[in-house]
């Protein structure tokens, strides 16, 4: 028998709305980071590799912190983790605003924002959805939470662009910092602590299964390992494009506004793609859905870099890559929950997300490094294409079924 689900006095509708607002608020400033690259390096005389390395640290530490934040949320509830994460995130934006040296930039934009995101991003929201919502709500809620983060990417870059042009990049970062603090009151709706697996079509629950047992079980499961490996590409592509696309378009002779609106278009298209992915996750094979997403990204990137850049091609690329942007999240999170249940979902999805963020670290860092070496981004664009094709193949052998647990498995002492 599965343990009873988390009890909440908050209706599912309110849980979803508050969780989606948290995802929107926390994803927006992070998705706008590319807008600050040229103003900051111009003012301080840094290279693009300096800014890129700071965001690379952010991606890596977001990934490093995610499993631990997920484990704490699984044990004690999401509210405290979300509040601490929001405080670190806001502090990181403030430090970034006043960073006059590469070291301070790396601390603010890298360390503080990275760990802050691990504690308050949409990944924690999805884990809370898995525990607090009835089973029938979950796939669409995963899509809605991901789409809300995507809408943050649509909403914040144009706002950031206007703030930078009107008040300067430092003031824009301070406004973003204030907005992140809104996460704290919204997190009250996700404050319930779950006591075990919620009823679902998944593996038989193991009473008092320890974190160590859960991790050992997961990393011995071939399908989970393949899922984790495939997610690396998602992070590589997304982080590289988020940070370096505005500069790539500026190098092509386009205005900064085109870069901002292209990022915004990605966010808006992603909202549609994430909702569609959540819906499709309930109606088709999740591994095939992931394979088609990764293949589609490679096709979109290939077309974009082979066609001369213009405002029209930039927006069209934003639409095509945006539909596929975070559409990997609903099938990935659903597969983790299908394989292992809800009890340690936030932690196990966190380890998958760590792979995602290692990819993000390399995508951002290599983007800046290879630009300084070669004077262009061509090598990283082509690497993104190859990785997309590889991940499409990696996901195909995944078995969409719960992990087999021996009835005689004993609980932890």
Predicted features along the sequence, with ranges:
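Residue-level signature of mid-helix packing/kink "hotspots" within the transmembrane helices
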Residues: 31, 59-67, 153-154, 267-275, ...
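Extracytoplasmic gate region of multi-pass secondary transporters
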Residues: 33-37, 219-274
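Helix-to-loop junctions at the C-terminal end of transmembrane segments
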Residues: 65-77, 274-285, 372
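C-terminal ends and interior cores of transmembrane alpha-helices
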Residues: 87-100, 296-309
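Hydrophobic core of transmembrane alpha-helices in multi-pass small-molecule transporters
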Residues: 104-120, 232, 313-327
